[in-house]
Amino acid sequence: MAVEDTPKSVVTEEAKPNSIENPIDRYHEEGDDAEEGEIAGGEGDGNVDESSKSGVPESHPLEHSWTFWFDNPAVKSKQTSWGSSLRPVFTFSTVEEFWSLYNNMKHPSKLAHGADFYCFKHIIEPKWEDPICANGGKWTMTFPKEKSDKSWLYTLLALIGEQFDHGDEICGAVVNIRGKQERISIWTKNASNEAAQVSIGKQWKEFLDYNNSIGFIIHEDAKKLDRNAKNAYTA
């Protein structure tokens, strides 16, 4: 697990890694009875694995490594160019590393107004200028503060658990802390691939049980038109 300079506004002061023994499994089937941070376990087959015998927890690699990024509003307000205050925080590549980080980070409802918190595939920077993001766009959902933490967690689990049929199209996700509502967006690579984008939008809504219509805005349109950019697709 790679650890960068860690903004104190993201990570709690006393971060203690938690030992997680089971992989992410069918998180969205657990319903509201599952505690935040709980990982679903499968039925045992009665066998004792070698990692249990040795006393060393088994590691469960993810298909991709992911990096958390943070844009600090206190620093951002003093910068002249967009993105100059954006910093990588941690990179993780296993289920155990993810939960250790997530359980010791501040969740969206506790972040300062104006903050932006990202989780992107490793080596992809959460910027329009990144060559992998340049031709893409984003789906966006809005949530009241009391629902933002769970929605952010379920979005992260869907990403790192490779739940999307067109997961290769996904760059990452961001939660924007704004006023009474939070925005969560999923960034994708190729905006012209309509079938893939619409599939991602529909599946995301299913995973989060989100009933409102959502829109997909192409990055190029957002750069040119800002808030006047129109949805290219809806789901």
Curated annotation (Swiss-Prot):
Which residues lie in Basic and acidic residues bias regions?
1-16
Binding positions for mRNA per the UniProt entry:
78-83, 110, 128-129, 178-183, 223-227
- Principal cellular location given in the protein's record: nucleus
Substitution effect: W69L: Normal bolting time and normal susceptibility to potyviruses such as clover yellow vein virus (ClYVV)
| Posttranslational mods | According to the redox status, the Cys-133-Cys-171 disulfide bridge may have a role in regulating protein function by affecting its ability to bind capped mRNA.
Localization recorded for this chain is: Nucleus; Cytoplasm
GO BP annotations listed = defense response; regulation of translation; response to virus
Outcome of substituting N176K: Normal bolting time and increased resistance to potyviruses such as clover yellow vein virus (ClYVV), watermelon mosaic virus (WMV) and turnip mosaic virus (TuMV)
Protein function: Component of the protein complex eIF4F, which is involved in the recognition of the mRNA cap, ATP-dependent unwinding of 5'-terminal secondary structure and recruitment of mRNA to the ribosome. Recognizes and binds the 7-methylguanosine-containing mRNA cap during an early step in the initiation of protein synthesis and facilitates ribosome binding by inducing the unwinding of the mRNAs secondary structures. Key component of recessive resistance to potyviruses.
Name-wise, this protein is Eukaryotic translation initiation factor 4E-1
Instruction: State the organism named in the record.
Output: Arabidopsis thaliana
